[in-house]
């Protein structure tokens, strides 16, 4: 059982890399995201508010910017797949689902501004610092909620193992991405916009 779980984790991680991380800019942003996520993980034990602010404002924005703005959207000649096919088979949040998640995140401060109690859940914020700390709590909830929602969703549309593997992958991605993409910034500075190693690795996979 453990062996199958680890193999499925390896497969999900490899598919995510080969389908959705061709751009060196995207890879570099994932490296930045991974480093800041690890800082956010550490801060979770000391100050969850700071953890949420770093996790969303630095880690998530840099990570998603890479996917939205820099990853090629045309035909994938390495994997022989259209962009539409890759979006359809995406285990986690594809671009359409990410738009929904990021929209909820971006609009949440506005909801708190309009209703300082957030439907009676909070004591009304008294100053900008208090406002940001309450926003951070909302963002932390959105992050955890997004993770659990897709995990449970996968239980029903795939199976329990796929959902648990995906959740494990997401939580451990910062460690994996640091190892996987630490060379990307240097390659980018040398003018390399697309990872040339993907085609070789896909052919031998």
What are the roles of these predicted feature ranges?
Residues 94-117, 178-186:
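C-terminal halves and exits of single transmembrane alpha-helices
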Residues 46-71, 145-157:
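Hydrophobic alpha-helical membrane-embedded segments
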Residues 104-124, 191-203:
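Alpha-helical transmembrane segments and their membrane-interface junctions
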Residues 40-43, 65-74, 110:
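Membrane-helix exit/interface motif
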Residues 11-41, 86-101:
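Membrane interfacial helix-start motif at the N-side
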Residues 39-54, 110-137:
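Helix-coil boundary and interhelical linker segments in multi-pass alpha-helical membrane proteins
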Residues 1-17, 68-92, 151-205:
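Membrane-proximal soluble regions of multi-pass membrane proteins
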Residues 31-42, 61, 141-144, 148-151:
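Hydrophobic alpha-helical transmembrane segments of multipass integral membrane proteins
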């Amino acid at each position: 059982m453990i062996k199958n779980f680890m193999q499925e984790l390896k497969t999900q991680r490899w598919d995510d890399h080969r389908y959705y991380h061709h751009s060196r800019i995207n890879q570099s942003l994932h490296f930045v995201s991974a480093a800041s996520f690890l800082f956010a993980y550490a801060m979770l034990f000391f100050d969850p508010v700071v953890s949420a602010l770093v996790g969303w404002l630095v880690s998530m924005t840099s990570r998603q910017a890479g996917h939205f703005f820099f990853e090629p959207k045309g035909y994938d000649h390495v994997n022989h797949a259209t962009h539409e096919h890759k979006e359809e088979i995406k285990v986690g949040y594809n671009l359409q689902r990410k738009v929904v998640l990021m929209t909820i995140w971006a609009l949440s401060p506005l909801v708190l501004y309009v209703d300082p109690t957030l439907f009676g859940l909070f004591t009304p914020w008294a100053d900008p610092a208090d406002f940001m700390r309450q926003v951070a709590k909302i963002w932390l909830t959105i992050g955890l909620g997004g993770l659990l929602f897709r995990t449970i969703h996968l239980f029903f549309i795939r199976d329990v193992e796929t959902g648990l593997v995906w959740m494990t992958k997401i939580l451990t991605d910062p460690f994996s991405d640091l190892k996987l993409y630490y060379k990307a910034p240097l390659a980018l500075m040398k003018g390399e916009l697309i990872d040339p190693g993907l085609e070789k690795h896909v052919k031998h996979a």
